[in-house]
Amino acid sequence: MSLTIAIVGRPNVGKSTLFNRLVGQKLALVDDKPGVTRDRRVHAATLQDLRFDVIDTAGLEETGDHTLEGRMRAHTKAAIDEADLILFVFDAKSGITPSDLNFASLVRKSGKPIVLVANKSESKAAIGGEYEAWSLGLGEPCSISAEHGLGLSDLRDAIMKASGGERIFASKNQEEHIALQSASLDDYIDNLEEKGDVYDKSKPLRIAVAGRPNTGKSTLINRMLGQDRLLTGPEAGLTRDSISVDWEWRGRHIKLFDTAGLRRKSKIQEKLEKLSVADTLRAIRFAEVVVIVFDATTPFEKQDLQIADLVIREGRVPLIAFNKWDLIENSQATLVDLHEKCIRLLPQVRGLRAVPLSGQYGQGIDKLMENVMMMHRVWNRRISTGKLNRWLETIVAHHPPPAVLGRRLKVKYVTQVKTRPPGFVFSCSRPKLMPQSYLRYLSNELRNTFDMPGIPIRISLRASDNPFATRSKKK
């Protein structure tokens, strides 16, 4: 069993910087502004020869339980309960504050082993803060600089001493797991795409939950998980980082990604929000299925349509969730109207799946997941070249390509070159002159004949002959 370590402390002491240093990549958003981290994030980490899971937490603040900061503190307390060991981080440059003293008392009451971490110790001004740290009653401070990577050997030794050294030396399997998690997201995506197209139920299905702010994305995920894992509330823009959580639905392992709400580009001014948006876009690209959460009381706003278009252009499986369905009075008539709008406003993908649900009460979640599983299989579908070319012969005979500059265009051959999403290459004469209307015809006929509704389909053209024609000539 692996060791779990929680990083706690007041805001802006460098917890997320230390988290990023331990996991080997910039997963948590970092900014000079206090209170950047709101949800707790768990990830596999490495420190020299030690292997463990680390939890990044929101900064502890003294405030009422029902405020945003109070709800964040409750999530940090949950992380302390989950952890086997606590890294209590303070800002050695600023010295010990009354908040540090109060929160040190809270951490001591947990009864967990604690390592006191004096961060930002690269400055001479930090010496005074390190002396003051003895007043916390947490033992000798371990001096580090998370930003510059200084003092990590001392931190490794302190963790070993506090934990007793058990459960934190990596086996070969753990090392492979860490190497995979520490790779860049782009490299991981490329690696997945190179491994082939066989549908494998044993691999976790990656689902991102996206949408504009305050549509109920985090509430929906909490209801799926059956626990208040993610911070929720009436405030718009609560989620900042893209947080991944593990879930199981009917025996299938799922990795869910909660994402920050996407606003119109013209409204995004702060650096922190720009970082959140970039994190959300990466989560969408990393996902296989993207559940786009619409507020059923105000659906199909311009931003909703732009997010759906983004998901389609990225080649992910788009699936719309009409959330807050419990607030809709005439549900049957509303659903008919919404489905008609889906067809009219999102023509890029015919047969787009849309499911009404209530994240607050859990209604419609099974229906949503049934559609997710079905569309994910379609997204992975591969069609034999023989079937494709028999289909091509039929549809070209029924509706041949148009004539351009006095000569009829010819489509001679088709093959599927990839899945996830399905991609097809058509061999034809003069591909640059093929009109978009005929490409749409090919795409729609592919959907109808091979039952591929609701997913992006990629079509490309090339000017080359049927490879079988060359063989027949040689004979």
UniProtKB/Swiss-Prot annotation:
User: Which processes are annotated in GO (biological process)?
Assistant: ribosome biogenesis
Q: Which Gene3D superfamilies is this protein grouped with?
A: 3.30.300.20, P-loop containing nucleotide triphosphate hydrolases
Query: Entry's PROSITE patterns?
Result: G_ENGA (PS51712)
Q: Which Pfam family, any one, appears in the UniProt record?
A: MMR_HSR1
* Segments forming domain KH-like: 381-465
TM stretches of this protein: none
InterPro entries referenced in this protein's UniProt entry, alphabetically: G_ENGA (IPR031166), GTP-bd (IPR006073), GTPase_Der (IPR016484), KH_dom-like (IPR032859), KH_dom-like_a/b (IPR015946), P-loop_NTPase (IPR027417), Small_GTP-bd (IPR005225)
Specify which residues bind GTP 1 according to the UniProt entry for this protein.
Answer: 9-16, 56-60, 119-122
Q: List residues binding GTP 2.
A: 211-218, 258-262, 323-326
Q: Which residues form a coiled coil?
A: none
Cysteines engaged in disulfide bonds, as pairs: none
Citing just one GO molecular function, the answer is: GTP binding
Subunit comment for this entry? Associates with the 50S ribosomal subunit.
Q: What does this protein do?
A: GTPase that plays an essential role in the late steps of ribosome biogenesis.
Kindly provide the name given to this protein in its UniProt entry: GTPase Der
Question: What species was this sequence derived from?
Answer: Bartonella henselae (strain ATCC 49882 / DSM 28221 / CCUG 30454 / Houston 1) (Rochalimaea henselae)
